[in-house]
Curated annotation (Swiss-Prot):
This is Trans-activating transcriptional regulatory protein. GO terms for biological process: viral genome replication. Regulatory transcriptional protein, which trans-activates gene expression from early baculovirus promoters. Can also trans-activate its own promoter, suggesting that it is autoregulated during normal infection of insect cells. Belongs to the nucleopolyhedrovirus IE-1 protein family. Keywords: Early protein, Transcription, Transcription regulation. InterPro entries: TATR (IPR005092). Transmembrane segments: none annotated. The lineage of its organism: Viruses, Viruses incertae sedis, Naldaviricetes, Lefavirales, Baculoviridae. Pfam families: TATR.
Amino acid sequence: MTQINFNASYTSAPTPSRASFDNGYSEFCDKQQPNDYLNYYNNPTPDGADTVVSDSRLQAASNFLASVNSLTDDNDIMECLLKTTDNLGEAVSSAYNAESFELPVAEQPSPSSAYNAESFEHPVGVNQPSATGTKRKLDEYLDDSQSVVGQFNKNKLKPKYKKSTIQSCATLEQTINHNTNICTVASTQEITHYFTNDFAPYLMRFDDNDYNSNRFSDHMSETGYYMFVVKKSEVKPFEIIFAKYVSNVVYEYTNNYYMVDNRVFVVTFDKIRFMISYNLVKETGIEIPHSQDVCNDETAAQNCKKCHFVDVHHTFKAALTSYFNLDMYYAQTTFVTLLQSLGERKCGFLLSKLYEMYQDKNLFTLPIMLSRKESNEIETASNNFFVSPYVSQILKYSESIRKVKFPDNPPNKYVVDNLNLIVNKKSTLTYKYSSVANLLFNNYKYHDNIASNNNAENLKKVKKEDGSMHIVEQYLTQNVDNVKGHNFIVLSFKNEERLTIAKKNEEFYWISGEIKDVDASQVIQKYNRFKHHMFVISKVNRRESTTLHNNLLKLLALILQGLVPLSDAITFAEQKLNCKYKKFEFN
C-alpha cells in the first residue's frame, strides 16, 4: 500500500502571473535557496514530472502549520502575524519560484464528475505526481482496476445570481428605479465617519509608492485554492493539516488523500477550501441536512478509492465552520498571504496600525459592515407587529370556507393502488395561489367522472407575495388560536425555491427543498406548537425540484382529503418522489 505523506510539498501548475513573480530567475538565484532544491530543478526527472520533495519546502510547510496553530494561544498578536508571515512566506515563495521554471503542461480538462488518479507504488523519496487538473497519460502507470475516482456531488440548484461585471455605460433613465442600498448593521453615518476621519487619512500618510510592483494584482487574480484536510487524530479530537495550493481540490484529494475518508464535505471561503471527513462529522453529532448528505455506507464501501464530495452551504456550513474553527484558519491564511503580496514596507505600515487598534480596543468597536439578511421593510414590519397582507388575506378568506373545509373522504383503494399513476399524471397545476387552492380544496379528480365544486372560489382573491422568514413566522403565529382552521400558504424564494405549508386542524404539512433564507426545522422548533409533517425534497436540479414539488402537492391533496392514509403517502414519497419525511410533535 502506498504510504501517504499528508504534509508533503508539491508543485502546482504554472500560471502567467506566478511565472513573473519576484521578477523571474534573477531574484530566485539571489535568495540563495538550498542546494538540494536547486539541484532538483537543474536535474529534472526523465519524464519531466515534478516528483521530488524538497526538504526545505517540507520544513517550511511544517513551520507554517505550527504558526497557524500558535494563533490559538494567548500570544502577542503582532508576534503571531510576523512569525506566520515569515514561515508561510518561505513555503509559498518556494512554490512560486519553482513554478516559474516548470515545463509547459497540457491544457486543463473540462470539469467532470469523475477523475482517475495514480495509485501505483512510488519510489522512496519521490512525491506523487501533482493532481492539479492537468491531463496526463495514466495508462502508462495503472489499469482501470487500480484507479481512484472522485465525484463532486455539488448542489445542482442554481446559486444566488450576483452580477459582478461592470457595465460599459449607464444612463439616468436606466438607473433611477434601481435601489443600490444595502441595509447594514451599523448606520451609514457611522461607517462614513470612520472612513472619512480615520481610515483614509492614515493611509494617505504612506508615501512610498512602488509603481512597478505587481505582487498584489497577481495575488488577487490567482484562481488556485489553499487546500486544508480536516481529519481524525489519534491524540486530539481532530486535526487540520495544510495540504497544497492547487487548482482542483477534488483531483488532489482523490489522488493523495482518499485513505483519510472517501466521503468529504467541502467548505469554501474565497481561495481556501477545507476537505472535512464525513465520518469525523458523524462522530461530532452535527446534524447533516438531508439535501447535503453524501452517499450511504453501502455505496461508499463498494469502492474505497472512489471519493464523493458535497459542497456545503447555509446553516450546515456555519455549523462546520464554528465547530472546527475554520474561520481562524481562513483569517490566518488570508491575512498572511495578503500581507505578503503587499511587500515588506506596506505590510509593516498596516501591521503597526492594526496592532495599535488592537491595543486600544478600537479594532473591536468599529462599525461592522455586515448586511442584514432581510430588507428594511421586513425589519420595520416585524418591529411594529405589522401583519403581512398576504397572511391576513389567507386567514380572512379561509374563514369563509371553515364550514366546508378540505373535502372529507374515506381511504380509497383505487387511489392507494394507483398512486404512482395519479401523482405523476400531467396536469395544469401551477404555483399560483388560486391553482393550488383548486387542487387542495376541490374534490381531487383522480377519475374523470368525479364532480368538482367551488370550495376555493373565495381563495382566488388572495394576492401572493414573495417568501421570507418573516412571512413564514407570521403565518404560524396567526394560526396559533385557529385550532380548527383549514388553510395553506405558498411561498417562492430566490432561485425559484418553493415552500408550501398546509394546515388541517392541529396538523401542519410542509413541502420544501433546500431553502437558503428559511430553516424549516428551526422555525418549527421555535414555534413549538401542534404537529408538523415535513416532506423535504432531496438535492436535485431546479427543473426536477419544480416537478417533484408539484407531484408532492398532488399527494398532499390526497392526504388532506382522506383518500390516502398518511403512512402510505410517506412510503410513496420516500421511495418514488426522492424526498425525506420528518415529524415534529408538541403538546
